[in-house]
Amino acid sequence: MGKMVSLNMALKVRGINKAAFEEKLNMFLNDEHSAVDKSLVEEKELKGDVIVKGVLPCPLKIPILEAFDKFIEDQKNNGLDIGYELKSANLGIDWIESDINSKDIDKVADIMISAGFELFFDKEKFSEFFKNESFYVEPREFNKDFDNEKICLKDPKNIYDIIAVVPCVFLVNENNLNGKEIPTSWEELLFSGNYNDSVAIPLSDLDMFNALVVTIFSKWGVEGIKALAKVYKKSLHPAEMVKKKGDSKNNPIVSVTPYFFTQMVSRSSALKVVWPKDGAIVSPVFLMTKKDNEKAKTVVEFFKNSSVGKILSSNGKFPTTVKGVDNLLEDNNGFLFCGWDYIH
């Protein structure tokens, strides 16, 4: 019987999305660091002058770690020992939260990185640390794409740093429009009434989903959240969104997806990529640094240099705040950020 069961059949029986499974399998097979991660039964105890922990958007993990490993070796020759654990964002943050829940700043990593709003914004968990002013980032010049008259990603309180963003855009199935106009903005998508029960949202992608909810609420309040609920049709993983074809009534008109995944869309596809004219909602990649470790500054500088900025940007797929890096954006590629007043 086992010989007659295909992988596709097994996934259907288990209720596992095929596209999402393929993506995770490919990441596992291509991740040279995964052999180490999977072999450990217990979390390894990190040692060093500077400890770095965090999560990165999945496509960024391998290239960042390759550059970081080389940096660590170079710093070891200079007498600086760095211990780190950086995982893919889809693996969750429970393993970092246990350090924070201890309320002991000595158990918290010197540098923490988080993709999205999931980790650093629980007032109950961080209140004591903020009260004691445990975190501080040195002010720096930002890339002009993120420091201009329309947007500023510099934290005025110098608690958080943002090193890159994951932009969220529309993927419109032109075969399903049925006479409707292609939505060109979040305001039109949410409030025109033309797209009720027509939009796919990646509920399982917490980084993106949290960014959607936080940003929409910060701009339009409860009415914005109600509007989001009205347009919602189904949850699709971004990898599945780019494969949707045809004019099936079960297919959404619009899929809200990270910009990175739109690079997988075929030119001959009926799927049209739309960068909202009121800005792509961003899920920031945040960095926090403990104030009392001077040696951590050297490591923070790694994430701010132009070579790493180019890796983060990935030719504009994950635009970076690092000064001098060309994010290869069009003039009309703006961003929508919840704002520091809202965060603080």
Model feature map: region roles:
Residues K53-P59, K131-E141, D155-I162, V172-N175, N196-T215, R267-I281, ...:
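Short beta-strand->loop
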Residues H33-K123:
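Early extracytoplasmic/lumenal segment of secretory-pathway proteins
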Residues A200-S204, M208-W275:
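Ligand-binding pocket segment of bilobal, Venus flytrap-like solute-binding proteins
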Residues F170-N176, V282-K295, I311-L312, T321:
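A bilobed periplasmic-binding-protein/Venus flytrap-type ligand-binding module shared by bacterial periplasmic
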Residues L40-K44, N101-K103, A109-I113, Y136-V169:
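A structural signal for short loop-to-beta-strand junctions that line the ligand-binding cleft
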Residues G179-N194:
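Flexible hinge/capping segments at coil-to-helix
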Residues K44-K47, E294, E301-H344:
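Extracellular/periplasmic juxtamembrane helices and adjacent flexible linkers that interface
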